[in-house]
């Protein structure tokens, strides 16, 4: 696959994820909470992808038991917990703020890489952390009178934390398995994770009593679950994880635009500056300094 095509997949994935709040807010209006919405999304994605694999190549379902830790990581630790945190923030706060807090994830990737892979923490990376923290403060309203509650802020940043883990575990999984296999078992384990948090029977009853939500649920699973995860996983398999993080950074921009134009959320200079700082940190983390750079490195 060409680099341009893989880049296009990553950008498209980010754009689709940026529209997530449309379906989340619609289902929330019909009484579904964040955990129920997460279960609907992941379980339907699992069924859709299972049908595709059964038609295309059943051998894609074969994995070794000793590798299941990878899918526990991408599915339960990442997708389940990320979905809960992100949907909760969208419902309780604003779509734009939720999308912006989500993109603290590259900082977590950097920190995990320093601990797990012994990558060095440079002055460049520290500057990115400062930009991110400042951006989060501005976007969340911490520096103004309309500050987020501490719990909302923690949950919003938690979405960024768990989102970052998909890249960490995903890289390991893609070394052995195809993008379809990785995505399917991610969804399957994510569904299992939500079973401990929801009552599927109650969700079915709630859906049956309001059939109008069925197209919303299918749209949520297809356009904000199956397609973007497939696009992202395919792109990640042909692109450096750090570059992938930059390309999908269109998500908070799309998310904020959805918040402003669809939900008529307020916009102010502080929020715009905060978004710009977070995106600047993402770009800064991925600028390749020349070998002649005088940037100081701080051992992790």
Q: Language model features by range: what are they?
A:
Residues 4-12, 36-52, 73, 126-131, ...:
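Hydrophobic alpha-helical transmembrane segments of multi-pass integral membrane proteins
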Residues 8, 14, 40, 79, ...:
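Helix-helix packing/entry segments at the starts of transmembrane helices
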Residues 42, 141, 213, 249-300:
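C-terminal-most transmembrane helix of multi-pass membrane proteins
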Residues 48, 53, 86, 105-130, ...:
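C-terminal transmembrane-helix exit sites in multi-pass transporters
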Residues 49, 121-141, 194, 270-289:
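Hydrophobic transmembrane alpha-helices of multi-pass small-molecule transport proteins
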